[in-house]
Design a protein with these regions (language model features):
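Phosphate-binding and adjacent anionic-ligand microenvironments
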Residues: 1-90
Length: 90
């Protein structure tokens, strides 16, 4: 599993939340998507059994991105795609 954490300002949180939860915008992804859930953040399920979720921490000002894919390099790349899409810097 690949896991990343990003700090944000209140203004930046609003932008990210609008992008993912209101506009429901997603990055261009090469993997076929099975479904998207917005129950606990934005979670994309892939047809290969993998998934990625971007969600805000409930206890600290962090955006967390977690990804599981069949191969570790795929999870790393998927996190990089989300990082670029949301313009996140660690």
């Amino acid at each position: 599993m690949e896991e990343r954490h990003y700090n944000y300002t209140p203004e930046r949180k609003e932008e990210i939340q609008r992008t993912l939860m209101v506009d429901k915008a997603l990055p261009d992804i090469d993997e076929p998507v099975e479904k998207v859930s917005y129950m606990d953040g934005c979670k994309i399920y892939f047809k290969n059994g993998g998934w990625i979720i971007a969600r805000f921490s409930g206890t600290e000002p962090l955006l967390r991105i977690f990804c599981e894919m069949p191969e570790a390099y795929q999870a790393v790349r998927m996190c990089e795609i989300f990082e670029e899409f949301l313009e996140l810097k660690n």
